[in-house]
């Protein structure tokens, strides 16, 4: 009974809880807590294993690699309604680990909107993140708490590759060029005709 106990499916936990809907229940989704903890532990180990003798360029590369893993976890789980609640439990731990590792490199707590990496994400937040100075810019570890719930779209049954209307609907939703248009641009005219 999903009104009493969570069910696990594809890395998410799903439950129906009492709410203000017409039928009395609303759905609550949360990232699978065990799986999320394993992923965060893996990232924490990678932060701990950053060598103390790295050059600045190597350190920046390592920060970017770890940031991409954090963003991947966030993007996979942002369709959950309780994503921010789940991420808050682990976010502070990663930030403190990162700051402890950056002390050897004279790291500081800098507001996220003043760092230069991941600008489309960090510009929305004023929370301080552990950062290191490289030349005259700051590069920081992104926070696991920089996530928001995004409602997923329902499947549009008319969107099919077999009809012109379906292809047009897909193009409008994704704003992508069609495959044959891409191939025409990739090859020169002589090759395309042959």
PLM regions: where:
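Non-catalytic terminal/accessory segments
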Residues: 1-194
């Amino acid at each position: 009974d999903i009104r009493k106990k969570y069910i696990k499916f594809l890395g998410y936990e799903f439950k129906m809880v009492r709410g203000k809907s017409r039928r009395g229940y609303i759905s609550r989704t949360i990232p699978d807590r065990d799986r999320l903890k394993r992923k965060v532990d893996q990232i924490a180990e990678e932060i701990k294993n950053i060598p103390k003798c790295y050059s600045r360029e190597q350190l920046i590369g390592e920060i970017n690699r770890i940031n991409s893993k954090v963003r991947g976890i966030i993007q996979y789980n942002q369709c959950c309604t309780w994503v921010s609640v789940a991420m808050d439990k682990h976010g502070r731990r990663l930030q403190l680990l990162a700051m402890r590792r950056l002390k050897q490199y004279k790291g500081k707590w800098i507001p996220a909107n003043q760092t230069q990496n991941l600008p489309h994400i960090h510009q929305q937040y004023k929370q301080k993140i552990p950062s290191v100075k490289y030349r005259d810019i700051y590069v920081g570890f992104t926070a696991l708490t920089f996530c928001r719930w995004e409602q997923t779209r329902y499947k549009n049954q008319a969107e099919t590759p077999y009809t012109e209307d379906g292809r047009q609907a897909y193009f409008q939703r994704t704003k992508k060029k069609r495959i044959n248009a891409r191939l025409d641009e990739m090859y020169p005219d002589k090759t395309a005709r042959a």
